[in-house]
From Swiss-Prot:
GO terms for biological process: 'de novo' pyrimidine nucleobase biosynthetic process; 'de novo' UMP biosynthetic process. GO terms for molecular function: dihydroorotate dehydrogenase (quinone) activity. This is Dihydroorotate dehydrogenase (quinone). Pfam families: DHO_dh (PF01180). InterPro entries: Aldolase_TIM, DHO_dehydrogenase, Dihydroorotate_DH_2, Dihydroorotate_DH_cat, Dihydroorotate_DH_CS. It catalyses: (S)-dihydroorotate + a quinone = orotate + a quinol. Its EC number is 1.3.5.2. It comes from Thermosynechococcus vestitus (strain NIES-2133 / IAM M-273 / BP-1).
Length: 364
């Protein structure tokens, strides 16, 4: 059996001790990916080598959604490449699509550090990043000089912290107009727990003007989705679905991180010495899996399977992917699982999907 250099050699070093800063490690990895994103012969060759190592291509994995071709149904979730510095690299790791951002109209530093915490025994992460990003103009500049992507690229839009809730629609609109030519689909993020008041925008009276404003400016028409929180009640989700259908949105991303902390094994966060319950922020990873899947199933049932769903939350194994697809997800996304398992996870998941497809295909 071949040794995975990330999982068996690099990851134990990165995750060892209490000195490792998860955010610094993320920045270093993203800087490397940004360098690989250059339109230079060496970088192109290295991307090709990564693709041979990590990617898996098979016609049975392909999906057609919103008129876009997805080489496979597994994408990179928003939050990893906030500024769009590595657009052409994500396909080399095997992703079938990538969602950039969250990006805001105004550049902003995010919340004070520390703001990213690993809960190893739970295979989870708590983050309170606060939409730290260089702004929509900087993302546009990065994408305009980047080599083209071979997979669909989504862009996740958030509200700037300095923008009052009453002016949220104008803030989203400014980013949407600037980035519209550069994304294949767009996601309205009103569900992060780390921007004060943002989740209030999920209420009907707050959300409707945002959806109306963005759809009115959506020319030529591109898929516009909404990302929702897992902590909503079924009644709240049903009300959101009414708006999604009324304003003809293309789909739902389910779900964002949770503010719940029930059932965690981790007692203390090493960086702060406090318990997970005492740390503000959104929880992602394995503890979110069941709730995210339940939300996907509810949306699928409420819409009779007519609304495409991107399922995200707690994917670590092929069975996790299959569970979300069976619940009604059209596509799925990774974030925390990829951090813990490393780049080889994509290939494992895709092999698992193919194995499941083989089992479903009757012998001739």
């Amino acid at each position: 059996m071949a040794i995975d250099p990330y999982r068996h050699l690099l990851r134990p070093l990165l995750f060892s001790g209490l000195q490792a800063d998860p955010e610094l490690l993320h920045q270093q990895f993203l800087s490397l990916c940004g360098w690989l994103n250059q339109d230079r012969s060496l970088c192109t060759w290295l991307r090709q080598q990564l693709q041979q190592w990590y990617a898996l291509s098979d016609p049975r994995l392909e999906r057609q959604v919103w008129g876009l071709r997805f080489p496979n149904p597994i994408g990179l979730a928003a939050g990893f490449d906030k500024n769009g510095v590595a657009r052409s690299v994500w396909s080399a790791f095997g992703f079938g699509f990538a969602e950039l951002g969250t990006v805001t109209w105004h550049p902003q530093p995010g919340n004070p550090r520390p703001r990213l915490f690993r809960l190893g025994s739970d295979r989870a992460v708590i983050n309170r990043m606060g939409f730290n990003n260089a702004g929509a103009e900087a993302m546009a500049a990065s994408l305009e000089r980047s080599p083209p992507a071979s997979i669909p690229i989504g862009i996740n839009l958030g509200k700037s912290k300095i923008t009052p809730l009453a002016a949220a629609k104008e803030d989203y609109l400014a980013s949407f107009r600037r980035l519209h030519p550069l994304g294949d689909y767009f996601v309205i993020n009103v569900s992060s727990p780390n921007t004060p008041g943002l989740r209030d925008l999920q209420a009907k009276e707050q959300l409707a003007p945002i959806l109306e404003t963005l759809q009115s400016a959506n020319h030529p028409r591109k898929p516009l989705l909404l990302k929702i929180a897992p902590d909503l009640s079924w009644e709240q989700i049903a009300a959101i679905l009414d708006l999604v259908q009324a304003y003809e949105l293309a789909g739902i991303v389910a779900t964002n991180t949770t503010v719940a902390r029930e059932g965690l094994k981790s007692q203390t966060i090493p960086q702060t010495g406090r318990s997970p319950a005492e740390e503000a922020g959104g929880l992602s990873g394995a503890p979110l899996r069941q709730r995210a899947t339940a939300v996907i199933r509810f949306i699928h049932e409420q819409t009779q399977g007519t609304l495409p769903i991107i399922g995200v939350g707690g994917i670590f194994t092929p069975e996790d992917v299959i569970e979300k697809l069976a619940a009604g997800a059209t596509l799925v996304q990774l974030y925390t699982g990829w951090i813990y398992q490393g780049p080889s996870l994509l290939r494992e998941l895709l092999k698992g999907l193919l194995a499941a497809a083989d089992q479903e295909t009757p012998e001739k």
